[in-house]
Each structure stands twice: as C-alpha cells, then as structure tokens.
Amino acid sequence: MAVTRLAVAAALSAAPPSSRRRRAFFHHSCRPLPSSAAAAAKALRASAAPAVDEEAPASPPPSDLGKGVENLVIIGSGPAGYTAAIYAARANLKPVVFEGYQVGGVPGGQLMTTTEVENFPGFPDGVTGPDLMDKMRKQAERWGAELHQEDVEFVNVKSRPFVIRSSDREVKCHSVIIATGAAAKRLRLPREDEFWSRGISACAICDGASPLFKGQVLAVVGGGDTATEEAIYLTKYARHVHLLVRKDQLRASKAMQDRVLNNPNITVHFNTEAVDVVSNPKGQMSGIQLKRTDTGEESVLEVKGLFYGIGHTPNSQLLQGQIDLDDAGYILVEEGTAKTSVDGVFAAGDVQDHEWRQAVTAAGSGCVAALSVERYLVANDLLVEFHQPVREEKEKEITDRDVEMGFDISHTKHRGQYALRKVYHESPRLVCVLYTSPTCGPCRTLKPILSKVIDEYNEHVHFVEIDIEEDPEIAEAAGIMGTPCVQFFKNKEMLRTVSGVKMKKEYREFIESNK
C-alpha cells in the first residue's frame, strides 16, 4: 500500500501526545524469540542453495566459538530446537544453535503465532506461544547454549566433519540436529501475491490487530485447530468472522469446534473454498470469490481480510539429496528414535512429524535427539566437554526516554508517537520506524535483529518503535496492515516499507546506502 508523505506528516503533526506513561524501548534487555521450528528458512525455501557437490558460495568468517570442530549444531528452534539445546547444554556439549527465521511466513515457528497454549504441562492458566518460546530460549541460554539468530544457507552432511554455513559464519561439527519445523501453506490464488500483506495473511496473531482490520468483516480458510484458533482470535478485533471449510465438517479438536460453533461472531461455511480475491476501484481488497465444493455454485463474500490456516510444509529443502525424506518432504527417522539415514544427523519436531505436530511432542523429540547425540559422540570417541558456569540473567535498568518531559533527541532509540513526531520533524538522520503489536511473536524476533543493525549506525539513524494498539492513528496513517513492519524516512519522505522479518544484511544495506 502506498503511503503518502502527506498522510504520515498529518498524523505526526496532529496526533496529541499520549498522556499515559509508556515503558521505554530497551534493546539490550529484549530477548530474541526466534525462529521456531521454522528456522533456517530462507535457505530452506531455497532449494536454490547450492548442492553439496556444486561450487559453494564464498565462506563467511569462521565461527568465533573456536577453530576446532564443535560437538553439535542445532538448526532451528521452537520447542524441539530449544529443548534439544537445553539438554545438550546441560550435558556440557556447548551446542551451537542457529535460530534463523522463516522467510515468507512467520518467524519463530508455529508457537510464535499462537495466542493461548492451554495444553502445555506446567501452565494451568495457559501461556502464549511467544512467552513459552521466550522461557525455553532463556533456559537454553542459561545452561550455555550458543545462540545465533542467523539464517542457515548451506549444509553438507555428506562428508565429515559436517559443515553448516549461515549468513554470518561457518561451523564444522560432529553432529547435527535438524529442528527446522514447517512453513505455512498458501492457497496460491490468482491474485494472492498482489494482496499478500495487503489483506491476505498467514498469521492472525501478527496482523489481526492492524487498525485496517478493526471493526471489519474478515475470513479464515481451514478446518483444523489452526484455522479455528485464528477465527476465535480475530473476533477480538473484527465485527464478524467467516470460517471457510472445504469439507462438510471441522477437523479441529472437539474443544475448538465447540468454541467456534457456539460463537455468535463466527459463521462457518462448510463445503466452501476460496477461488480468488475481489478488489474495489481503489485497488483495495473488498471480498473473496467463493465456490461450493458440492454444487459448484459461485458467489462473492464481502470481507476486508483473508487469513490462512491450512497447514504447513516441512522445511527440509536444505537436506534434499543428503538424507532420506518421504514423499511429502518430511525427514524419515528410525521408529522411536531421532536417527536419520545419516549417522550423526538427527531430526526433531515438525520437520519429521506429520502426524501429531504438538508442542509437547516436539519438545519430547528434541529431548530424544539431544540424548541420542550425546550417546553418538561418546560411542565414537568424539565428545569434548565444556564446563561452563550457569549464566544468571541480570535485571536491566529500564528508563523512560519517550514521555514528553524526558525526550532527548541525542539518543538513538525511542518509543511512542511523541518521539516519532519529534524525530520525524527535527532529525536530519535516516529515521527507522518499527511497528509492533503486543501479541506478535515475530515482532519479538525482529527487535534484537534490528537493534543490532541500528547499533552499527548509531550516529546516522534514529529508531522509534510504535505499538499499533497504543498508537492506532499512526499505524493507520502509515498504512500498516500487519506486524512487524519497518518504514524508513528521511527529510519527511518515506523511502521504503519492509514487512516481516528479514536478514540483518537487508536492513544494513539499505541504511548504508541512505544514511
């Protein structure tokens, strides 16, 4: 969506300062909540990554973990990857974890897009997916796991030691755990790309809070737990939600079915599929073209947004041709184990589980994989123990720079609409605005990534975080339809909008060329 200089300027000039006190954005205490079971995905999407026997791209600087061969590299995070990291770190393996992110989908994996997890043991009142992942990540880090929020681009498990190459480093290792999860499927409607992030989304929790969806009629496609959960979540913001189900019944759990069917703000359309998107003369999404699967009858349903909840595809492309996969792309493991067809390579989580796909089963498989790695290393006389002190997290002092009286433009990082108005009108620097929402897991992933890049250009950039629920008028004027979203301004001109989570080098290159 094109955002005019006039609209943003008007919003920044007219919006009254918020009277409520807001906590300051403190980048150093933000813990990344990375890529879940969907890590390493840019590479993963790239079956385009070079094959092992092809010429590999130039190697990045070697890992600073040491010049030797590491015990274990874990590719991916989520409940499988983080659990594996916890067990491996406690066993003194000092695992190297590439958390990565999911290109074209939702960083942090499926739990990062889940509102309430009500069936994970130990949380009688439930827990949000991002909060659960945050706790797991901190636990892995506390016991000595080496975490890198980087995208894996190349894997060679055909020769030893194995080689894992990310966007920033190369690591050699004796064993690998693949916990890359699965990516959200798309319908591939004729106009899907045109309206992706402009009305179509695969993440209700990321994009549902957008001011452009509030009070509107929305639709969700799918009949399982993911789709029903998205429909329920969207009723917090939408006037009404339509759930489109291809078959004549829901596949979701009985509890989720009851909640959907008894919700007056949700209408379920059985035997119905989406055929395409309909737009108005302004080029905005105005509806969905539907088709009955039983009669073939077609109709148009007026909605302002369409959300997908139609399942996932395993992120195993990096391993194609190197380990055994089934016809759907899931990694094949020996029954009851995490062992793949390659000795020393193990798989955990949704990348090898096409049946259960639960957070607790993913965590269990991560545990099995880590214990299997330890046995493998011992049996082959490869284990080198690293005894590290347990890392205790220190409380960070939180200061509020962004209330009107305390604002200081000499600082680089700020939060809230008052700060944005000040830097927008007064700063000669490039202005980077990050739009977030409270329940957005990918926002937690992006904050530390972007923060590190901003630190590199401290004298050339001003950074402001905007919570779209606290400052909806700013988000609406900027045309924000989902979070996370980054906009760059200079001299009151908007230069670029970047939706979702990207690699550090993409933000770095843009800032470098526009500072």
UniProtKB/Swiss-Prot annotation:
InterPro entries in alphabetical order: FAD/NAD-bd_sf, FAD/NAD-binding_dom, Ferredoxin-NADP_redctase_2, Pyr_nucl-diS_OxRdtase_2_AS, Thioredox_Rdtase, Thioredoxin-like_sf, Thioredoxin_domain
Any GO MF annotation of the entry: identical protein binding
Family named by the database record: Belongs to the class-II pyridine nucleotide-disulfide oxidoreductase family.
Subunit-level organization: Homodimerizes under reducing conditions. Interacts (via thioredoxin domain) with the plastidial 2-Cys peroxiredoxin BAS1.
NCBIfam families registered for this protein in UniProt: TRX_reduct (TIGR01292)
PANTHER family linked to this entry: THIOREDOXIN REDUCTASE 1-RELATED-RELATED (PTHR48105)
Protein name: Thioredoxin reductase NTRC
Species name: Oryza sativa subsp. japonica
